[in-house]
């Protein structure tokens, strides 16, 4: 059985994926039942005005709780006086509770009363901590369940002393007695008191109530509950036995040491009810009807109708699924109506909403093969909208049996196009695979993986619609072609227009009032015929006329491709009723569109017949506002073409060390041939060319400038920035500094600096003495080899150097010869001493070790 879900749901704010449809959780039901039972218990004991609604409000002062504690203590002392031998078997309270009678709700006195009651329950009654509650649980309603369970346990224990207990305690005793009889168990040592006589339970009513609760699930395979005896049932596939009792108007189930409602028990154990989509609570009040699946209302807005989403949840094999149309939420469905035979530019017409589309797809009638062959005309002769169409189609659907539904349905999708810049609401169908514009179609058993659909009751228009401006120029209305197989209807085949001509930016299909035809050379019938021959699918073929010069008829009123005349088409179809004010405006709008489309077609024909330079290129951006003509190449376009024609520029190798902007790019003065300035310039060129060794892998891309262009427009590589000022003498220091500024690469330094100047750690760290009296120096001591003599004389040489330096600084009248001797002596001493700045260890040949081989003590 095919199921239809909501189509085209409107996007809304993201919420939880699945939301419970119950007004409150079913787990809270047994708490309400217990509060009702405890309220009746306290009302009978103390004559209070208490019920389930004001149960916690009466208890929040602690007065009733302390009063009941004192009552239980008195009953225990009286019971102890009668049977003192039971003191060892049953814990009995010996002391009562102090209570402040002037306590108000929410005050500290009320909290003190509740705290005294809690302490009495723990100390005197021995109630387990699992069943206890705290002061905040009652005052602030933080944990109502613990309060209810504690009072119920107190009622069980106090019943042993002869205090009246809640009704649930009496039901528990009945079930315990039944179990002892069935299992032949002995009675407890202190026999429990006899429960008071109560109204007998009508198990016939119990069976009816259980059957009513279980039958809320209408799945083919329901959760099994087998009756063993009165009030005893076996549930599910296991041998679990449950005891069910009626407490006032509730059906209670004995679970472990507590109670639960049958509805909540089924929600937890029934596989069908454990799903996220539960039953509606309103379904309990409905009269029993024919078995249906689970129905869940899906509502997008408060003012919109509510379709039913039917969900099948059963353990039996499901029937074959008949898939229907599905589109994502970003797309909206628009069914083709009989009003679509009118002019396509009628944008005031109301589009069908997705809410109306879902019943339309579900209730459309499917004609048989004989009906389709005998009456190729449409079955809906007048436009029907809204509830009239839905009621008519739903009446037709009632008479159809479920076995009539075919399999292998090909999904169809109707997607509205985007409105163009002029605001026309033109809708055009976009085909998916093989598309049928009508929503109804009849299928035969598939012979292939995806059989194409046949034509439906509504005849397809034999028209070709021109695409909009914003739409793709290759997608058009699928043409209807005669199928080669006998007994089959028409097959819709999408047509791709030839990309050789530009798309016409019209807003709708070209047509006249009488359905006349127009002949234009811009639409090539030969291209259409070729595309039709290539678009055959499966065993379906397309019959295309052999005459390639046949005019393609573009009309807006034709609906039946096998009809003979315009008069017959007018008789078969009923036009849309137009008002007196809308009709002239519609005709004026049609005339404007026809004139605009004719002009665009003439421009397109002129472009195809013109030269190749005026034709629209196959790539790039086509701007329809230019009148269908591509702008002529002029201005910067000529410069680009000229630069591309000249070919790739010549690449020059440039040395990075001696690189700078060549003198060709600088403004050269006008020099006569043979002048000394020209000779100097040529000499400098020769020197620079000799000093340019080929750098490894470094080239600068340059472009030879045009004759009329300035040298300053020469492009330079972005990685190397040329200096703005020229260096006249490349051998000078200034030239070296100038050349160094333009470099961005690392070069090998002449002298490797110290490791600590580079802020690098040595590979071998020095040993550290952590004794407080011997702290190592922060300056590491270099390693000195014993066979290196000059290194041992380092302190003396330093002293001698200092002496020489001091003498040379103090004496001013020394001759040049003495100064030269002192300089030679100091230079020889400095060369023999290890450099203190670098602190590098020496090898045997006197060369410094590389930085990788340094070691420190």
UniProtKB/Swiss-Prot annotation:
Question: What are the Polar residues biased-composition ranges?
Answer: 301-316, 366-382, 695-716, 826-836
Show the segment(s) annotated as Disordered: 1-21, 282-572, 670-716, 759-857
Tell me which tissues or organs this protein is expressed in.
Expressed in the cortical tissue (at protein level).
In terms of domain of life, where is this protein from? Answer: Eukaryota
Per its record, what are the GO molecular function terms? actin filament binding; cytoskeletal anchor activity; G-protein alpha-subunit binding; microtubule binding
GO cellular component labels: actin filament; ciliary basal body; cytoplasm; microtubule; microtubule plus-end; plasma membrane; stress fiber
What the entry lists under PANTHER family is as follows:
GAS2-LIKE PROTEIN 2, TRANSGELIN
For region Interaction with ADORA2A, the annotated ranges are 432-857
Assigned protein family: Belongs to the GAS2 family.
Annotated compartments: Cytoplasm, Cytoskeleton; Cell membrane; Cytoplasm, Cytoskeleton, Stress fiber; Cytoplasm, Cytoskeleton, Cilium basal body
- Describe its partners and assembly state: Interacts with ADORA2A (via its cytoplasmic C-terminal domain). Interacts with GNAS, GNAL, GNAQ, and GNA13. Interacts with MAPRE1.
In what ranges is there compositional bias, type Gly residues?
Answer: 508-518
Bias (Basic and acidic residues) occurs at 534-550, 559-572, 676-685, 815-825
The species this protein belongs to is: Rattus norvegicus (Rat)
Which keywords belong to this entry?
Cell membrane, Cell projection, Cytoplasm, Cytoskeleton, Membrane
Q: Which GO terms describe its biological process?
A: actin crosslink formation; microtubule bundle formation; negative regulation of microtubule depolymerization; positive regulation of G protein-coupled receptor signaling pathway; protein localization to microtubule plus-end; regulation of cilium beat frequency involved in ciliary motility; regulation of microtubule polymerization or depolymerization
Q: What is this protein called?
A: GAS2-like protein 2
Described by its record, this protein's role is as follows: Involved in the cross-linking of microtubules and microfilaments. Regulates microtubule dynamics and stability by interacting with microtubule plus-end tracking proteins, such as MAPRE1, to regulate microtubule growth along actin stress fibers. Enhances ADORA2-mediated adenylyl cyclase activation by acting as a scaffold to recruit trimeric G-protein complexes to ADORA2A.
What residues does the GAR domain cover? 201-273
Q: PROSITE patterns under this entry?
A: CH (PS50021), GAR (PS51460)
Q: Where is the composition biased (Basic residues)?
A: 1-12, 759-769
**Ranges for the Calponin-homology (CH) domain?**
32-159
């Amino acid at each position: 059985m095919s199921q239809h879900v909501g189509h085209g749901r409107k996007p809304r704010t993201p919420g939880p994926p699945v939301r419970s449809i119950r007004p409150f959780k079913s787990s809270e039901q047994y708490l309400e039942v217990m509060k009702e039972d405890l309220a009746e218990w306290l009302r009978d004991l103390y004559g209070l005005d208490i019920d389930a609604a004001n149960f916690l409000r009466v208890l929040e002062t602690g007065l009733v709780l302390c009063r009941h504690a004192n009552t239980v203590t008195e009953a225990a002392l009286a019971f102890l006086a009668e049977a003192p031998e039971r003191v060892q078997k049953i814990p009995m309270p010996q002391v009562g509770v102090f209570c402040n009678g002037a306590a108000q709700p929410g005050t500290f006195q009320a909290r003190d009363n509740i705290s005294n009651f809690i302490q009495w329950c723990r100390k005197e009654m021995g109630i387990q901590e699992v069943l206890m509650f705290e002061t905040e649980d009652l005052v602030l309603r933080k944990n109502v369940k613990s309060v209810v369970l504690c009072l119920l346990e107190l009622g069980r224990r106090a019943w042993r002393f002869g205090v009246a207990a809640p009704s649930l305690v009496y039901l528990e005793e009945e079930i315990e007695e039944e179990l002892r009889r069935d299992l032949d168990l002995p009675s407890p040592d202190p026999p429990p008191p006899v429960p008071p006589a109560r109204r007998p339970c009508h198990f016939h009513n119990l069976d009816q109530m259980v059957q009513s609760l279980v039958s809320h699930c209408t799945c083919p395979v329901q959760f099994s509950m087998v009756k063993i005896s009165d009030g005893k049932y076996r549930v599910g596939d296991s041998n679990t036995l449950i005891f069910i009792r009626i407490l006032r108007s509730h059906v209670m189930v004995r679970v472990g040491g507590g109670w639960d409602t049958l509805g909540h028990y089924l929600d937890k154990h029934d596989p069908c009810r454990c799903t996220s989509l539960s039953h509606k609570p309103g379904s309990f009040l409905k009269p029993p009807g024919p078995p249906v699946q689970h129905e869940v209302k899906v509502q997008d807005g408060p003012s919109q109708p509510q379709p039913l989403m039917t969900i099948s949840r059963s353990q039996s094999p499901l029937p074959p699924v008949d898939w229907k149309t599905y589109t994502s939420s970003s797309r909206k469905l628009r069914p083709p109506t009989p009003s679509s035979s009118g002019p396509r530019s009628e944008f005031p017409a109301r589009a069908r909403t997705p809410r109306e589309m879902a019943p339309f797809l579900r209730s459309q009638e499917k004609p048989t093969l004989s009906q389709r062959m005998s009456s190729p005309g449409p079955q809906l002769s007048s436009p029907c909208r809204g509830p009239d169409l839905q009621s008519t189609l739903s009446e037709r659907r009632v008479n159809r049996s479920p076995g009539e539904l075919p399999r292998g349905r090909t999904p169809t999708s109707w997607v509205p196009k985007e409105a163009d810049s002029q605001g026309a609401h033109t809708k055009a169908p976009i085909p998916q695979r093989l598309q049928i514009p009508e929503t109804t179609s009849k299928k035969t058993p598939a012979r292939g993986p995806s059989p194409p659909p046949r034509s439906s009751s509504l005849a397809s228009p034999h028209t070709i619609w021109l695409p909009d401006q914003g739409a793709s120029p290759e997608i058009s209305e699928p043409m209807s072609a005669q199928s080669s197989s006998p007994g089959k209807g028409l097959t819709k085949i999408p047509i791709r227009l030839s990309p050789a001509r530009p798309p016409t930016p019209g807003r709708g299909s070209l047509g006249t009032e009488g359905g006349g035809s127009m002949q234009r050379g811009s639409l090539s019938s030969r291209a259409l015929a070729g595309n039709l021959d290539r678009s055959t699918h499966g065993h379906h073929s397309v019959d295309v006329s052999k005459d390639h010069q046949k005019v393609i008829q573009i009309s807006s009123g034709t609906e039946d491709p096998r009809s003979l005349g315009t008069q017959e088409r007018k008789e078969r179809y009923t036009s849309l009723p137009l008002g007196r004010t809308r009709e002239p405006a519609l005709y004026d709008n049609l005339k404007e569109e026809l004139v605009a489309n004719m002009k665009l077609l003439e421009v397109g024909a002129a472009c195809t017949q013109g030269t190749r330079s005026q034709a629209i290129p196959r790539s790039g951006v086509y701007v329809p506002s230019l009148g269908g003509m591509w702008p002529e190449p002029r201005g910067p376009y000529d410069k680009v073409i000229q630069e591309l024609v000249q070919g790739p520029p010549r690449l020059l190798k440039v040395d990075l060390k001696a690189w700078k902007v060549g003198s060709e790019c600088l403004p050269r003065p006008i020099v006569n041939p043979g002048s000394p300035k020209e000779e100097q310039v040529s000499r400098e060129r020769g020197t620079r060319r000799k000093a340019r060794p080929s750098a490894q892998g470094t080239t600068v891309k340059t472009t030879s400038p045009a004759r009329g262009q300035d040298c300053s427009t020469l492009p330079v590589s972005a990685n190397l920035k040329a200096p703005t000022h020229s260096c006249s003498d490349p051998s000078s220091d200034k030239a070296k500094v100038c050349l160094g500024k333009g470099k961005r690469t690392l070069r090998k330094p002449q002298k490797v600096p110290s490791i600590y100047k580079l802020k690098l750690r040595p590979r071998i760290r020095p040993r550290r003495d952590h004794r407080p009296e011997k702290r190592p120096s922060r300056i590491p001591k270099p390693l000195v080899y014993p066979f290196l003599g000059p290194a041992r004389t380092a302190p003396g040489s330093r002293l001698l150097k200092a002496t020489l330096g001091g003498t040379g600084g103090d004496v001013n009248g020394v001759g040049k010869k003495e100064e030269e001797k002192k300089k030679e002596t100091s230079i020889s001493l400095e060369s023999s001493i290890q450099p203190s700045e670098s602190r590098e260890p020496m090898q045997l040949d006197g060369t410094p070790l590389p930085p990788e081989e340094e070691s420190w003590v």
